[in-house]
Amino acid sequence: MRYITHIIAVIFIMLAHSASAQSGGVVGVAYYDVDALYDTIPSRFYNDKNYTPKGKYKWDSQRYRQKVEHIAQVIDSLHMPIVALYGVENEAVVRDITAIVGEDYAYIHRTQDFSLGLDFALLYYGDVFFPEEVTSHHNALCIDGYIGDCPVTIIINNNSSSLGVLLNRNEYKVEDRAIIVLGKQRAESTSRWQLSDVMSEAEATGRGTVVYYDRWQMRHRIATNIRNIEQCNVYIKEWLLDMEGRPKPTFRGSKYYGGYSTSLPIYIYFDKLLDFSTKKL
């Protein structure tokens, strides 16, 4: 089974187009679940004691720094003007990431009301995306802004019910604008809002973002009403995988592997002159 998994991963690499090449008329957006990137300082508001120097994972400054460098490496490799992250503990972690990436990213971060203490962040080029309003909700973050002259709503989501609440709350905004939903969601929960699950084609060919019982699963998805999509896929590089062809994690169980994440990033390219549905959602 390990051999089969590795072969699938090799095929995966061959099929996935590089997400690093980007022309002037195309915009790329990526999503990455960084898998519990905590700092080393104990929190007073939630239980993160496992991710402290004396905790279960012996999460010291060296391990923390290596993880930050790994995430920055992935972001640099993606070379995307907009990158959504889930799984960062706080704004200080986001600052540490943006301080060492090769590109000059601005960022948006909001503290989430979540028992694990893990937040969302949006990294973006300030000359590509122009945010105007940020709405935070339990397990979701909504950023309204512009790409060029086109109004765009980006929702980073970790729960399908949160997505529905946000879209209902902001119903007056979602007419005549491009909508991009990134993260964990069910296809049926986005289709009711006339958003297309653009990861379904990759999923049908056996690709996914995580390996579960030796099978790829598309645990993270992208849904949108944008029509002129150039490319949408799972981002994979050989160095993101372990010897068995699975995403190389920081931990597997309590054993330290010093990897990147249990998940692979996903991405979408679309024409900068956005073509999107004008139907009321």
PLM regions and their residue ranges:
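N-terminal, active-site-proximal structural segment of metallo-dependent hydrolase catalytic domains
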Residues: 19-100, 104, 273-281
